[in-house]
Amino acid sequence: MADAEMAAFGAAAPFLRKSEKERLEAQTRPFDLKKDVFVPDDKEEFVKAKIVSREGGKVTAETENGKTVTVKEDQVMQQNPPKFDKIEDMAMLTFLHEPAVLYNLKERYASWMIYTYSGLFCVTVNPYKWLPVYNAEVVAAYRGKKRSEAPPHIFSISDNAYQYMLTDRENQSILITGESGAGKTVNTKRVIQYFAVIAAIGDRSKKDQTPGKGTLEDQIIQANPALEAFGNAKTVRNDNSSRFGKFIRIHFGATGKLASADIETYLLEKSRVIFQLKAERDYHIFYQILSNKKPELLDMLLITNNPYDYAFISQGETTVASIDDSEELMATDSAFDVLGFTPEEKNSIYKLTGAIMHFGNMKFKQKQREEQAEPDGTEEADKSAYLMGLNSADLLKGLCHPRVKVGNEYVTKGQNVQQVSYAIGALAKSVYEKMFNWMVTRINATLETKQPRQYFIGVLDIAGFEIFDFNSFEQLCINFTNEKLQQFFNHHMFVLEQEEYKKEGIEWTFIDFGMDLQACIDLIEKPMGIMSILEEECMFPKATDMTFKAKLYDNHLGKSNNFQKPRNVKGKQEAHFSLVHYAGTVDYNILGWLQKNKDPLNETVVGLYQKSSLKLLSNLFANYAGADAPADKGKGKAKKGSSFQTVSALHRENLNKLMTNLRSTHPHFVRCIIPNETKSPGVMDNPLVMHQLRCNGVLEGIRICRKGFPNRILYGDFRQRYRILNPAAIPEGQFIDSRKGAEKLLGSLDIDHNQYKFGHTKVFFKAGLLGLLEEMRDERLSRIITRIQAQSRGVLSRMEFKKLLERRDSLLIIQWNIRAFMGVKNWPWMKLYFKIKPLLKSAETEKEMATMKEEFGRVKDALEKSEARRKELEEKMVSLLQEKNDLQLQVQAEQDNLADAEERCDQLIKNKIQLEAKVKEMTERLEDEEEMNAELTAKKRKLEDECSELKRDIDDLELTLAKVEKEKHATENKVKNLTEEMAGLDEIIVKLTKEKKALQEAHQQALDDLQAEEDKVNTLTKAKVKLEQQVDDLEGSLEQEKKVRMDLERAKRKLEGDLKLTQESIMDLENDKQQLDERLKKKDFELNALNARIEDEQALGSQLQKKLKELQARIEELEEELEAERTARAKVEKLRSDLSRELEEISERLEEAGGATSVQIEMNKKREAEFQKMRRDLEEATLQHEATAAALRKKHADSVAELGEQIDNLQRVKQKLEKEKSEFKLELDDVTSNMEQIIKAKANLEKMCRTLEDQMNEHRSKAEETQRSVNDLTSQRAKLQTENGELSRQLDEKEALISQLTRGKLTYTQQLEDLKRQLEEEVKAKNALAHALQSARHDCDLLREQYEEETEAKAELQRVLSKANSEVAQWRTKYETDAIQRTEELEEAKKKLAQRLQDAEEAVEAVNAKCSSLEKTKHRLQNEIEDLMVDVERSNAAAAALDKKQRNFDKILAEWKQKYEESQSELESSQKEARSLSTELFKLKNAYEESLEHLETFKRENKNLQEEISDLTEQLGSTGKSIHELEKIRKQLEAEKLELQSALEEAEASLEHEEGKILRAQLEFNQIKAEIERKLAEKDEEMEQAKRNHLRMVDSLQTSLDAETRSRNEALRVKKKMEGDLNEMEIQLSHANRMAAEAQKQVKSLQSLLKDTQIQLDDAVRANDDLKENIAIVERRNNLLQAELEELRAVVEQTERSRKLAEQELIETSERVQLLHSQNTSLINQKKKMDADLSQLQTEVEEAVQECRNAEEKAKKAITDAAMMAEELKKEQDTSAHLERMKKNMEQTIKDLQHRLDEAEQIALKGGKKQLQKLEARVRELENELEAEQKRNAESVKGMRKSERRIKELTYQTEEDRKNLLRLQDLVDKLQLKVKAYKRQAEEAEEQANTNLSKFRKVQHELDEAEERADIAESQVNKLRAKSRDIGAKGLNEE
């Protein structure tokens, strides 16, 4: 399907099929068939790899991720070529194996293509996300499409089922299976949705619907939410898991419209009603009711909205994130309404649901001094009784004191609390189950319409195969169901394969793969199978689960390959037997099976239910009749038997009904896959998917496919694709049939010719051959393409070379012409020629222009005519094309109708022929059967009489023999069990081993005696003499049967002769058919050729249309050019007239001027050349236009005529060919139907022969039953011991994990402390920076004050200057008045002024110098402010780093929390394992107790043997000799029995001693367990405390971080303020500079007038000196601040160095921690070594047991050995006492070490307290491990030498531990030294801080002194100013 066709699917197209671009990319991907392979992988199951080398049966390959692996050659599997990537049907893969299937699914899943075909299967993978592949657009696109026409989809499966139902008139079924959470329920909904859309019954259903109800489509769809509410629940894998299976039948009418529907359910998980796992929850309806969406429900049911108030529904989770319970309640309620439930029915359902919740809250207590239960409060009982319509007192009485029928009387029975609780649970489960089944029945009644129904499609949604760690009765039922379904699939699949091969004429031996699973099915369901034995045990009152197990072992262990004894693994639930299913071996635990199968109820309460006032409840239990139901006269017995139906029998009955339904349908298979267990979209867990593919039969289907020919291609396609491999085999010119061509082609290739077969229409390939052909094709294509590329490159190079040569020749010609022109262009004659030439043609141009005008007019008229003609032709062509399209559509429709009619006709003819053949065959068979029946009935009657007598006699004998053999087997099994238990005792004490030998020898003697007795019993064969006569009679009857068989064989030979004749006729028919096929293929070939010609003509027509359009465009361009030509011509005309005028003027001028015409001649030449060029262009355009128009007219007319003729011819030929085709098809159908009829007759005859042979084989097999027994005691013991070692290893690993987690916790706490310390250092650095900022701020304030003083001084100078100016003005006026008088005085004053002026200039220079110094001070202050800004930025960076550290710390804290939670889970798992170990210990104790019981049973068996011997003596009383011999044997047996009893008593005494040891070991184990739990609690408390501390630290860090951010913001604000102040100061300083410059100018202008201002100038000089002093003071202050800043920087550097030192010390401590870790690992390794020694001891024990078994022949010396064993026992007791003393000494040593550790802890309490606590905890762990090892070793010591060696090893271990403790002590000392060094560093830092503080105080004191001096100087300055003012005033006054 191309991309254009996929557009019909809309947005779903990319999720259904690869695009063409992807397919092309996949085909061009590099691939090497010989090197690209799959190799096995531990994690990913299989990985892609490339083979590097092969040698010696091994393959070295490099995987995709670069890893090199070496595997066996048979483990390597080839990859498929790229054309098979993401293939839609995996059955078409050329290499069909597990990795190919897995990777195809994985790659499709990665592209979100979740549906894939695998032969008959449709495999769907759960996407865990919404995909747009289910909308109405997709439904419409799949409707009516065949499977091969559309991508894989559940809609395609549904539509194919629907179409098959309509065409084949056969019921269909869709089987949807898979694990929980794989998407079964969703796909079932989609199937129902599809049928509801495409097969809606229309308006009629809407008219007929009842008010309040929905349409039938709505009801079918709404049945799902109603059933989901009561049958779905949350599980670990799936939030909406269906806990029941269902088979939904959707019935259709004859026209394919919906008629009705019904539902059948299977295996509702009713145990979920009262019990749920921790991560699961109960059925949805309970939580929907409690959602409070309908408060009236809560009031009606007397419940709250809290699920935890009800015990039954609150054992797991109560909410699900993906489910809105309130909305679901409304959906359920509306579904009830749509389904037509009455309000009374709805309320009854809700009431029973609420009553079940109240049932779970009913409490009972034990009566004092009685084993009798009584109610503990009646409130919940009252509520539940009210809701159920019962009396509360009667309910409680029925629960606590039920009535039981004993004989013909009823007796009241007392119940204890446990029995009452069980009864309540059983009643709740039964009520819920019956209510659910009633709902299904009620829904079926609603969906049952009165409309006629013809066919149905069944949808089966059932759980897939289940293999859990704990498999019980429910898993057996589910797996049995899947086994039957898989057998059904296998049989169906291979029947289809068989039909395909038969249809294609492939020789094939029929293999019924369905029989592969028959052994397992028979083992479960046949008489004396598992189900049968279970039901038989349920009939016996004293039967238990163990008796059921014993019966299973007796009947099947060793007799059936599918029944095995399981290998119990420690840590997992015990398994009792294993079954080999098709999906794998499953271990089953049988605990509680009898109870589950019987499913008993309290019949007193059931009687109350039957009388309930709640109508629904009484109806649910109306037909219930328990085991105690009264008999109704003569029919009571039958009624009782029929009512007591077990769960297994009911399940088998339902399953048989289901299989009957499925066998009557045409099945379709859907397998749902769960990709991963984390519900992650797009992620595929390879091992999980492979497990499911095995379980759901996909790989089984592949196995069946590989047996046959999985790849098949039509001959035509094969020839087209692979002809390139050998083109000579199929010549191009001549016609060769596709089949013959394929045969020639394959015969010419170098391949294995047994790997393919030729059918009638297809060639069939074995797996792998198609991939080889693809590789050969790729190699051939690469060679051809390489050759084409080489030739193409050669042609292109030659063309390029030719162009270069032509270019060179052209250049040479141009060069020659240019050289010639350059040689003659300056000749005078040439110049004259150039001038005169244009003037000669002016007259000719006028004539030419006139002719051109005329021609132009004619061309224009012709063009208009051609345009009109062209338009007419275009209109005709459009109409012809429309007619052609209409004809094509009509032909297509007629072809479709004809094909449909042909198909229907063929089908009807086939059906008719088949029915006629069947009728004929049946009549013939009926006649034969009647004849045979007449002959056989007489013989049968005679034989039946004889056989009945013989059977009675044989049955009696077989019963007696079976009884004897059964008792013998029971005795043997019990003796085996006894020997097994004796062997277990031998492992503990050697004495018991020898006793066991003696017992076994005695037992062997008993067996020998029994064998002798059996030999004697054989004398009874004399009694069979009478039977031999009867056997002779039977042989006579057998002879008669043989005669009958001979008759049958004669009939068979006759039929074979007929068959040969029919085969010959078939061969003739086949030859005729082949001839007809060849004729038909020739006609098809001619038809294809004609179709190709039609397509070519259509393509030619389209090309002509394109050319017409191009010509039209060209005509338009020509018209535009013509228009441009007209304009150009007008311009030329105008130019010509202008030129003519100019020519006249020029001629006049020439006449006047004479020879001055050279310029005019050149102009005339140019114009003439232009005119000639334009005329040539116009002529060319006109000619070209006329030629194209004529060609177009001619071509158009020819093409139209030709197309019309071709269409007519093609239509006639097509009609003729279609007639011939239909005739040939009819003939071919007749021939094929005849052939099929003959083949079917042959198959039926062969089937009859096979059935007769099978019957004979069954008769023979019944007479050939054998016994098999296998003793697997040794393997079981080895398993147990390996499991024990495995568990101990797991315990060690868990302990190592705990220690690792504690170490991780310690490292995280250390990291937290380091982070805290770093944070404190950063805070200190921040404080230092803040202090520096504050000092800088203070300096800035001082500068501001200084600046204000300077401005005041400047203002004062300004005032002085203005005063001086006024004085100068006064002096000027005074000078003008007194000028004459004081000239001499002025001269002197002038000199003085000059002197003063010089002084003033000096003063101004001094002021300027002062200004420059102030400028320098300003720059220096600016630099300091910049430095402060850098410091501020650094503090900001530090704050950012702190933020980053805070985030990192948060991450670390989150990781630590996660690890803490993981450690918590690990602790819980370790606690669980400890509990499992305790249960194992109790099991061991129980095993010992069972051994005692077995000893007692052995005694009983001896007694039974004695009784059996006595019975035998009574039976053989006829012969006195045998009685005498039996008497002797009895005496011998009694003597041996006494010996055995004495030996057993001794063994019992030793067992009691060992029991005491076990009790002591148990007490020690309990102590260890209590110690572990206490330590775990302490660890929990420590972790909680650490968690709280870390949270507090996080809070404190958060607050400090907030403070840091606030301080940073404050610093930024201050910085901005300082920048603003600095800018203002700069502005003021510049203003002051300008003012000083103006003042200087004024001073210069007033130099002559400063005589009187000298005093003021002196004052100004003094003020200037004061200012200098002030500046010096400020500079000193600034220097002091600078020094202080430098000191602070040094302090920061010192703290940085100390931080680095601390980090270095942290690294050293981490290295020490690693050293401790390595020491811990060495201790763990030593522990593992001790475990290895323990396993060695166990192997030695096993060897000893083997030796004991080999020594069984020496059992006669048991009594003498017993005394020796007693002595050895005393020695062993002495040895154990010695070991006990050694243990006490070692415990004392450990206590001393503990004391030393305590002292070390007190010494290092201050510095390394935490480390010591860790070390102390580790020491305690080591002590516990040491004690545990000592106890285990003390118990496992077997013999003196082994014990001594073990003690030596323990002492060596103790010395090693002591050394390790000494190392730990050294580490503690080092840590103490480290703590002291830390203390010294802290003291040094404190001293440094004190010195810095004293320096700061000193600087502060100096600052205060400087400020005081400044104040003094300022006061002096003020005094001097005042004094100067006074002096100035006095001077003025004096003057």
Swiss-Prot record:
UniProt GO BP: adult heart development; ATP metabolic process; cardiac muscle contraction; cardiac muscle hypertrophy in response to stress; muscle filament sliding; regulation of heart rate; regulation of slow-twitch skeletal muscle fiber contraction; regulation of the force of heart contraction
Transmembrane segments: none
Sequence ranges assigned to domain IQ in this UniProt record: 781-810
Domain Myosin N-terminal SH3-like per the UniProt entry, residue ranges: 32-81
SUPFAM superfamilies: Myosin rod fragments, P-loop containing nucleoside triphosphate hydrolases
Coiled coil: 840-1935
Database matches in InterPro entries: Kinesin_motor_dom_sf, Myosin_head_motor_dom-like, Myosin_N, Myosin_S1_N, Myosin_tail, P-loop_NTPase, XRCC4-like_C
Renumbered residue ranges of the record's region Disordered: 1915-1935
Subunit (UniProt): Muscle myosin is a hexameric protein that consists of 2 heavy chain subunits (MHC), 2 alkali light chain subunits (MLC) and 2 regulatory light chain subunits (MLC-2). Interacts with ECPAS. Interacts (via C-terminus) with LRRC39.
Note, other: The cardiac alpha isoform is a 'fast' ATPase myosin, while the beta isoform is a 'slow' ATPase.
Domain topic, free-text comment: Limited proteolysis of myosin heavy chain produces 1 light meromyosin (LMM) and 1 heavy meromyosin (HMM). HMM can be further cleaved into 2 globular subfragments (S1) and 1 rod-shaped subfragment (S2). The rodlike tail sequence is highly repetitive, showing cycles of a 28-residue repeat pattern composed of 4 heptapeptides, characteristic for alpha-helical coiled coils. Four skip residues (Skip1: Thr-1188, Skip2: Glu-1385, Skip3: Glu-1582 and Skip4: Gly-1807) introduce discontinuities in the coiled-coil heptad repeats.
Record protein name field: Myosin-7
Organism of derivation: Mus musculus
Taxonomic path: Eukaryota, Metazoa, Chordata, Craniata, Vertebrata
Gene: Myh7
